[in-house]
C-alpha cells in the first residue's frame, strides 16, 4: 500500500490561520501586533526567495514586518550594530538574519548577538540549551516544524527508533533533541558514519537532511517506516526533489513527506509561531508588568 502523504503545505496554512486569528484578537483587545525584522545581507538568489516567503507570511498573519536588505559589502561591525538597534526596539519581537552570510562575517558571532528572547530562529546557545534541558522556549524552526507535522498527523513517536541523516546545527543536532522529547531512541548519522544503509534499514522514523538529491535509495527504507525528507534540491531541468528517492520509498513507507510541499512550508509557519510566542511570553507590557 502506498504511503500516506504528510501534507506540510496544508498543515502550515492551518497554523498560519491560527496565528492570524490570535493576532486579530490581540489587536481587537488594544494590544499591538507582533513585529518581525528580517535581515538579508547580499544578493544570494536562494536567500532572496526564502526571505520573500517569510515576509509574505508576516503580512498574511497581520504581523508588523520590517525588511533590511543590506549590500554584500556590509561589514560585520555594521551588521552587529543593526542587531543591537533591533534588540532595543520595543516594536520588534523577533530578529531573523538570513543565512548564509557573506565571507568575512562570523555567523556564530552574529547569531549570538541576537537577544535570546528575540531569537525566533532558535539558534542562540540559550535556546538550544533550554531545548537540551527539556525546558524549551524558542525552538529551531525546522525541527519544531517537523515535530508539529508528526503531531498533527496523529503519529505516535514514543518508543520509535529514529534515525537522522545529517548532523547540521540547523536541522540534525536540534532535531535529535526534539526527538528525545518526543520519546524516540535517536541515532544521528554523519559523514563519518559507517554502514549508513544498516542504520536506515533499522529506522522506524527516518529524517534526512543532507542536501543531496535522491541520496537515500527507496529500497533502504524499512517497511512501514515514517520518512521525513528535509532536502530541497533543484535539478538542471528546474525540477525540485528531496534527499530521498520518493517514488520507491513511498511504496515501502507508511508516511512520507513530499518535496516540495512537506517540511519547507512548516519552517516558515514555525517562524511565525515563534514570533507570536516571543511577543506574548517575553514582550507583552501587560505580562511584564504583572511579573
Swiss-Prot record:
EC code: 1.5.1.5, 3.5.4.9
Protein name as it appears in the record: Bifunctional protein FolD
GO biological process, one term: tetrahydrofolate interconversion
InterPro entries reported for this sequence: Aminoacid_DH-like_N_sf, NAD(P)-bd_dom_sf, THF_DH/CycHdrlase, THF_DH/CycHdrlase_cat_dom, THF_DH/CycHdrlase_CS, THF_DH/CycHdrlase_NAD-bd_dom
SUPFAM superfamilies for the chain: Aminoacid dehydrogenase-like, N-terminal domain (SSF53223), NAD(P)-binding Rossmann-fold domains (SSF51735)
Keyword entries, A-Z: Amino-acid biosynthesis, Histidine biosynthesis, Hydrolase, Methionine biosynthesis, Multifunctional enzyme, NADP, One-carbon metabolism, Oxidoreductase, Purine biosynthesis
Pathway involvement of the protein, from the record: One-carbon metabolism; tetrahydrofolate interconversion
Sites where the protein binds NADP(+): 166-168, 232
Subunit structure: Homodimer.
Function, in words: Catalyzes the oxidation of 5,10-methylenetetrahydrofolate to 5,10-methenyltetrahydrofolate and then the hydrolysis of 5,10-methenyltetrahydrofolate to 10-formyltetrahydrofolate.
Annotated GO MF terms: methenyltetrahydrofolate cyclohydrolase activity; methylenetetrahydrofolate dehydrogenase (NADP+) activity
NCBIfam families: PRK10792.1 (NF008058), PRK14186.1 (NF010783)
Family from the record: Belongs to the tetrahydrofolate dehydrogenase/cyclohydrolase family.
GO cellular component: cytosol
Catalytic activity: (6R)-5,10-methylene-5,6,7,8-tetrahydrofolate + NADP(+) = (6R)-5,10-methenyltetrahydrofolate + NADPH; (6R)-5,10-methenyltetrahydrofolate + H2O = (6R)-10-formyltetrahydrofolate + H(+)
Organism classification: Bacteria, Pseudomonadati, Pseudomonadota, Gammaproteobacteria, Enterobacterales
